[in-house]
Amino acid sequence: MMSDEKNLGVSQKLVSPSRSTSSCSSKQGSRQDSWEVVEGLRGEMNYTQEPPVQKGFLLKKRKWPLKGWHKRFFYLDKGILKYAKSQTDIEREKLHGCIDVGLSVMSVKKSSKCIDLDTEEHIYHLKVKSEEVFDEWVSKLRHHRMYRQNEIAMFPHEVNHFFSGSTITDSSSGVFDSISSRKRSSISKQNLFQTGSNVSFSCGGETRVPLWLQSSEDMEKCSKDLAHCHAYLVEMSQLLQSMDVLHRTYSAPAINAIQGGSFESPKKEKRSHRRWRSRAIGKDAKGTLQVPKPFSGPVRLHSSNPNLSTLDFGEEKNYSDGSETSSEFSKMQEDLCHIAHKVYFTLRSAFNIMSAEREKLKQLMEQDASSSPSAQVIGLKNALSSALAQNTDLKERLRRIHAESLLLDSPAVAKSGDNLAEENSRDENRALVHQLSNESRLSITDSLSEFFDAQEVLLSPSSSENEISDDDSYVSDISDNLSLDNLSNDLDNERQTLGPVLDSGREAKSRRRTCLPAPCPSSSNISLWNILRNNIGKDLSKVAMPVELNEPLNTLQRLCEELEYSELLDKAAQIPSPLERMVYVAAFAISAYASSYYRAGSKPFNPVLGETYECIREDKGFQFFSEQVSHHPPISACHAESRNFVFWQDVRWKNKFWGKSMEIVPIGTTHVTLPVFGDHFEWNKVTSCIHNILSGQRWIEHYGEIVIKNLHDDSCYCKVNFIKAKYWSTNAHEIEGTVFDRSGKAVHRLFGKWHESIYCGGGSSSACVWRANPMPKGYEQYYSFTQFALELNEMDPSSKSLLPPTDTRFRPDQRFLEEGNLEEAEIQKQRIEQLQRERRRVLEENHVEHQPRFFRKSDDDSWVSNGTYLELRKDLGFSKLDHPVLW
């Protein structure tokens, strides 16, 4: 066993020349401080020796949201790692978890004696106190992982075998079934990454078939196996003919000798072979091989080959028992058994290859079938067309009503506006009924129709009544509901911006672009594994990435995207009840994550130190500006003002790569004040995680808890829980929130999905508080930007002279990427990064600390506006300042 461990270590060093080269050029201590990805089974490697069982206590990091480490007993057998509180619980099958190390990405960090197992669904963090125990566990895990991967490669249809008897939970079997079905080919994919193969990460239908056809070496191997099998069968036929000659040559008296003397031993041998057969193949494997001519009859021979069960090799009693004849006949028996073994293993290998290829073809056919248009899709398209037509008609009616209202004198308009505000307040107070019955709280996916039937409040400027009939309170058709929501949002915007500001906002909105100058490039030729494999557990904000992985937006502009639904704060500023104001503030905090649902495939540009960005939106009524106030650590600060609210925050992100997923942990606090009520709200941000970084369809999820407090009024607070996705449940991206009063009693319930809509209440009487805007046409070709994101980097010629030269829109690499010039964008990106490194070196050599121009640090170490940006913009003061050269 020790020799096998040495050979395994040598093979792992040989299969990774790039890693060994880099480690040779670095010091041993620095290599121990970094994470090392453990290599898996590669190429034609065959690891069939069963490793011994390993067990003992290890420290395991507690699952989120719990913190710290707890002691658990781990049991490793044949590549399956089980853990429980004690060894007794393991024996009783009272497991806390079960990990297939063959399907996991394993990384180790020797300096801290940590072992990470990334199963894509969960990341298991293990720690060992003793260095000897750490080395022992790492060695055993390597061997078990290689053994398990070899087993999966040989028997891909038996991945679920080791989980069939597990009693973790009732739903565990379903979890492992889904894991195995999705990961059946993960070993081969991992081998491709480790050998440096240029694998495409695109998930489009045009690349699935070529990737499948590239693995034609499996079919070639299958053809060779069948050819060898044919040769073995011919050789077996010749041996059987020779044995038949011996049978006819010798006389009958020898038969009795064989029957009386040497027949007991083969019976025992037959029983032992049966035990071997059941152990190797299983009780369900009963495949037979019909051998063609020249077999003349049902000659039976003792053989342990299960695939030759139809050949009757047991009639040895017809042969002579002479010493010379017996030895010759025994040699023929051994040769025949040996060849039969070869035939069996060759056919089994060919069968496994054919099964894997059949599974690939079946998956492709299912994907193609699911992508074809169905009657349901056609019906939804028709419903959408009718909804758009109805929406156009309702908007036309609204314009006529608004035109009539403008003909009135100004006092009447003011009076109408007051009536609208009062009416809106009464209706919204009625809509947000305290629906706190847990029995009526339904699952989003199970009762989606009820949520679309939720009550929607629609107010017309010409309406003077508060009563709404029951027939008008509920909308049963999906398209009608969407139309009414859009119309209600349009009406709210118009009511908030009556007068000249409305006209200028409409003109500005009509001038804004609806698509980017060029579509996004393909990043399928970039090997993310080569970039990220040496950065396991590191902060990726310090790792240089190719420009193709970026989107033509900056982190400072991403902060502005959080104000896409600022009308929620405008609504909150009009509601006298602090409890209901908290509902809209919570909806605004949740809406900041909506655009990220479609944007898991790219990352924003990192701002350089001193870079700024401004966004003046007359149509939404706010003025926004931001600045990169620190580079290490990277901190971005922003500030926005409106007549109804003030918004500011400073955020820094820590990105960590865990093998198959990447965690984004934000650090900072968001603040919103409503001057009309004197409210000051603050809340934290939740953790984000991007899955399937290296292969498959990337997707993002947010999990954690947001706590919203009013620092100037303790009458209420809110908790919003972003629920972590579970693989045995279809309810992903859900949120649940509760507004509590001063005594801790729940007053309002919030639920929904953070990328779709938020509801308040319970059951069919729930009121829709917020719904995401529809995505623009062809958004997949333009980085999956929302309409608001498409407008962020647009350069307005009229305001170009008002911007400081440090504004993001002047940044050349980002502009070249937006225009589709990748080569020039990469050149400019490297030049800007080098320029920033030189600036930082000069500042450090002269012991000069960078001072942000438009933000200052407050007493609580947060960054707030110093009030100079908007004043300088009014007086064209940016041209009088000395600005650093950023690009």
Swiss-Prot record:
Residues 16-32 have a biased composition (Low complexity). Residues 268-280 have a biased composition (Basic residues). Residues 51-146 form the PH domain. Its main location: endoplasmic reticulum. Residues 1-35, 261-326 are annotated as: Disordered. It is a peripheral membrane protein. Changing residue 60 to I: Abolishes plasma membrane targeting and nuclear localization. Phosphoinositide-binding protein which associates with both cell and endoplasmic reticulum (ER) membranes. Can bind to the ER membrane protein VAPA and recruit VAPA to plasma membrane sites, thus linking these intracellular compartments. The ORP3-VAPA complex stimulates RRAS signaling which in turn attenuates integrin beta-1 (ITGB1) activation at the cell surface. With VAPA, may regulate ER morphology. Has a role in regulation of the actin cytoskeleton, cell polarity and cell adhesion. Binds to phosphoinositides with preference for PI(3,4)P2 and PI(3,4,5)P3. This is Oxysterol-binding protein-related protein 3. The lineage of its organism: Eukaryota, Metazoa, Chordata, Craniata, Vertebrata. The gene is OSBPL3.
